[in-house]
Regions:
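Short amphipathic alpha-helical interface segments
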Residues: 2-32
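Short loop/turn motifs at secondary-structure junctions and domain boundaries
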Residues: 60-63
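Short, amphipathic alpha-helical interaction segments positioned at domain boundaries
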Residues: 65-88
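Beta-hairpin "wing" of winged helix-turn-helix
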Residues: 56-58
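Residue-level detector of well-ordered alpha-helical segments, enriched
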Residues: 3, 7, 39-43, 68, ...
Length: 88
């Protein structure tokens, strides 16, 4: 699978509207037309690798299948702002 900046943009927009920093979010909860939960999860892994999303919930089991996150980081908001302004 490849990095998909358009899908990443849609995920960040979704997160901006739906994440409150308290609730656990995973790919199956994010509904984006034309994207499967597996495709969304892959992009979430990339966002997590770059510290653009963060998980601040309960401790997860090491074998957790999906990426969990609770909010965007400041870096995540910076990227979202840049993507909204087409400066990337």
């Amino acid at each position: 699978m490849k990095r998909d900046l358009e899908l990443i943009r849609k995920i960040l927009l979704w997160a901006e509207q739906n994440c409150d920093g308290r609730h656990d979010i995973m790919a199956p909860f994010i509904h984006i037309a034309g994207a499967t939960p597996i495709e969304i999860d892959f992009q979430l892994r990339l966002l997590r690798d770059e510290k653009l999303i963060v998980y601040e919930g309960r401790k997860l089991k090491p074998v957790t299948r999906w990426v969990h996150f609770t909010r965007l980081t400041s870096k995540g908001y910076d990227l979202l702002h840049a993507l909204k302004n087409d400066s990337i």
